[in-house]
Amino acid sequence: MKTQTTWIASLLIAAVGQTGAFAQDIRVDMNKVYPEKTIRLDEVASVRYIPLGTTDDVLFNGKIVHLSDEGIAGFNKKEGDILVFDGAGKVVGSFNHLGQGPQDYPQIYHLDVDWKQGEVYVQDNFRQKIRIYAPDGTYLRTLNSQGTMREGDMYHYSDTHLIYYKNPDGRQFAPYQPVTLFSKKDGSATFLPFTKTDENIVKATGGPFGDMKLNAKHVSSLYKLGDEVYVNEVTADVIYRIEKSDALTPLVQRTPSYQEAVGKDYFLVITGANARYYFFKRQQALLEFKGNAATDTKSTFVAYDRKQKSILQPTFIHSDYPSLNITLDKLKQCAGSSNRCFLLMEAFKLKEALAEGKLKGTLQSIAEKLHEEDNPVLMVIEFKK
């Protein structure tokens, strides 16, 4: 045991350059079957609903990436639409700069918003740029990123900086410092003292073009959950939280180690952080193709209960929609206000549930006013301590 402890400590030194006390004693067993539990949201959280505004020009069928009192932002990746709402769901702006011009983006990889500065930051990996617009779509400026950013791993960090996770240079992996603070003013970069020593990417076998690495939708390396930023590092078996001082604090440790043969089947990914729980995904590391799609059949989600100090597989239910089982794969969290998770509820599905008599209370009243073609309703969940 002493040898194993010393070995894990050495990995921490390699990953961050210094040892540090864990913020909490959280250890996730990657091979354990944790107990299942049904939890009433009415007992552990407050719930409210935000119907996203609908106009002829604002139709949302994409991804919400920012949720706060100041506003909500999302994008339709295929169409290139960026949609901005206020905190109550009213449309603030809708724009599309998909194109090849100097003020355009050829594809949206990710975006975030700084409401104080009135700026929307769009990740353009194709050209290694960050395009900056006002919430109404007015073009402001472009910054050159310092290398290629990982898809989805770019966020508003402070009044003066963005933060992103840099991909390795070249085809051959070598240890490097990927966590980058990026000046919003001049594009200068500062690298946090965190060294990445191995790749953490999901792979798939049996594809039409042979074995392949899959993109960041399976395992991101940088997450902004509410107003806190987290770093996943599989080599050191640790998830870190970036403090306001820019220091990295180890938060969660996985067992067995990814370095051991019995630990290589899964990656540990943080998917939620709130006053009551931390949510994690145990991501299957090696997928198999069936036809043209890689299938993920073994990944599981677990929660660490910060009050009970235990790990479980929860299913949440709510009195407004008693027959709806809210599992952790459906519950989302993004950048924005802390302690907020959400469920994206499509209008046509709510109308179907209403017709079947499945809705009650506030959600029933909202559904009665919806049209099937309307934009989704956000079920916003704020957990209690």
Where would I find each of the regions flagged by the language model?
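Beta-propeller blade signature
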Residues: 135, 176-186, 237-240, 293-308, ...
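Blade-loop segments of beta-propeller domains
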Residues: 53-57, 90-117, 124-125, 147
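Conserved blade-ending motifs and adjacent loop-strand segments that build the rim/top face
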Residues: 249-269, 307-338
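Asp-box/WD-like beta-propeller blade repeats and closely related beta-sheet repeat scaffolds
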Residues: 125-178, 191-207
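Blade/loop signatures of beta-propeller domains
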Residues: 24-50
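Structural signature of eukaryotic scaffold interfaces centered on beta-propeller domains
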Residues: 62-67, 110-116, 154-159, 166, ...
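Short coil/turn segments at the loop-to-beta-strand junctions that recur within blades
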Residues: 56-57, 96-104, 144-151, 195-200, ...
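Loop-centered beta-sheet repeat module
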Residues: 188-245
